[in-house]
């Protein structure tokens, strides 16, 4: 167990890259400056091939192993996009763009993978090839799917793929992983309840969509408590309830919206079915109607057992077995690396960000002390998965 000496030696350089990227956040697929910076570094490191424009604005650098060695290609993925949030960290390297910031640590993810790419391109101590993948639009744009659909796996012959995300609250130098589902599917719904408007003093002459909607909100919680197996997680959260315009008027319509998170395909199907039944059934019982718009987004992120073992062993080699939780509870957040794991076997791991603000918080900042651990982890994954 040990950090790679070079990961410590290059920490200042990599921290500089991270802070440069942090100052220049870009959203979804509009990551042209970010992608240009990444591609420039990969060329500077001597990658054998650097391809841009995959999945619209993604970048892939290909690094071949030692001369004369043959073997498969392993993909290592980092995300590039920021979030539409106003930063309040007050850091010297804070966002220069109002309304945009790296509030999920993708700046750190890129920097660590760039550091690993520099080391791998220099040492090439593996048999096969490493594809370092820099993906746009993780934050709601399904950039991972776009890169898969653009033929990335086939173009580079990728046989296994690995992803990593920082986790606030997990101490620096620790890792967390598990086989099977590790992050949830992320679905969204919108429900329009239509009743009959009227005077608030004469509700008997109206059909009140606010009362109807309130009953729907309450009943949706029975999906988790009464419809699903208690051991099969589901979250149904109503996060918007909009309606009405005056204190003495019962409105004609109200609108509800929210999210559903699940960890298995069966529960995902059941949750959607029950949400539709509950909304339309309760509306009908109140004399109203409910129009349900249900959109499926990212699928469940499912780690493959063999690759999970490679990832866990690589983390243990980096930080020590006692610093690796190999049975972490799944997270109910979503992650579009799921699409890459549907296309190829692989694994997704969490790396500790220490005592920082939570992800997507305006006070969040990536912890630069994590950088040597992330670089060392990526190098260990590549060298274990492609043992010479």
Task: For each feature predicted by the language model, list its residue ranges.
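Divalent metal-coordination and catalytic microenvironments
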Residues: 21, 61, 76, 106, ...
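Short polar/acidic secondary-structure junctions
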Residues: 65-68, 152-153, 354
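Metal-dependent amide/peptide-bond hydrolase catalytic core
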Residues: 211-388
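Non-cysteine beta-strand/loop elements that form the S-adenosyl-L-methionine
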Residues: 75-77, 189-191, 348-353
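Conserved acidic residues
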Residues: 48, 158-159, 345
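Acidic/His- and Gly-rich active-site-bordering loop/insert found
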Residues: 1-102, 107, 111-114, 118-126
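Histidine/acidic-residue-rich, glycine-tolerant segments that coordinate divalent metal ions
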Residues: 59-60, 82-101, 107-108, 114, ...
């Amino acid at each position: 167990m040990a950090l790679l000496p070079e990961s410590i030696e290059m920490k200042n350089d990599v921290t500089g890259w991270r802070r440069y990227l942090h100052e220049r956040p870009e959203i979804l697929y509009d990551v042209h400056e970010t992608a240009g910076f990444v591609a420039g570094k990969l060329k500077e490191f001597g990658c054998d091939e650097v391809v841009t424009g995959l999945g619209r604005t993604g970048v892939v650098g290909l690094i071949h192993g030692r001369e004369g060695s043959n073997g498969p290609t392993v993909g290592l993925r980092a995300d590039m996009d920021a979030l539409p949030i106003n930063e309040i960290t007050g850091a010297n390297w804070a966002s220069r763009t109002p309304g945009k910031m790296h509030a999920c640590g993708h700046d750190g993810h890129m920097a660590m993978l760039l550091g690993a790419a520099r080391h791998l391109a220099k040492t090439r101590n593996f048999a096969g090839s490493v594809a370092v993948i820099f993906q746009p639009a993780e934050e709601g744009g399904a950039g991972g799917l776009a890169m898969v659909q653009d033929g990335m796996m086939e173009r580079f012959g990728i046989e296994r793929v690995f992803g990593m995300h920082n986790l606030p609250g997990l101490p620096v130098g620790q890792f967390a992983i598990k086989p099977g589902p590790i992050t949830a599917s992320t679905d969204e719904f919108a429900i329009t309840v239509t009743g009959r408007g009227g005077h608030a003093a004469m509700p008997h002459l109206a059909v009140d969509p606010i009362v109807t909607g309130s009953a729907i909100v309450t009943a949706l919680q029975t999906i988790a408590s009464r419809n699903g197996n208690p051991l099969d997680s589901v979250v149904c959260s109503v996060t918007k309830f909009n309606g009405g315009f005056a204190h003495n008027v019962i409105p004609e319509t109200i609108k509800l919206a929210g999210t559903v998170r699940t960890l298995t395909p069966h529960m995902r199907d059941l949750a959607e079915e029950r949400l539709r039944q509950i909304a339309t059934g309760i509306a009908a019982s109140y004399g109203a109607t409910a129009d349900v718009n249900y959109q499926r987004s990212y699928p469940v992120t499912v780690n493959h057992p063999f690759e999970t073992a490679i990832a866990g062993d690589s983390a243990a080699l980096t930080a020590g077995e006692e610093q690796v939780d190999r049975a972490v509870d799944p997270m109910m957040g979503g992650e579009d690396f799921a699409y890459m794991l549907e296309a190829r076997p692989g694994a997704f791991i969490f790396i500790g960000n220490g005592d920082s603000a939570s992800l997507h918080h305006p006070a969040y900042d990536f912890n630069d002390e994590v950088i040597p651990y992330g670089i060392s982890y990526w190098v260990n994954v590549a060298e274990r998965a492609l043992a010479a």
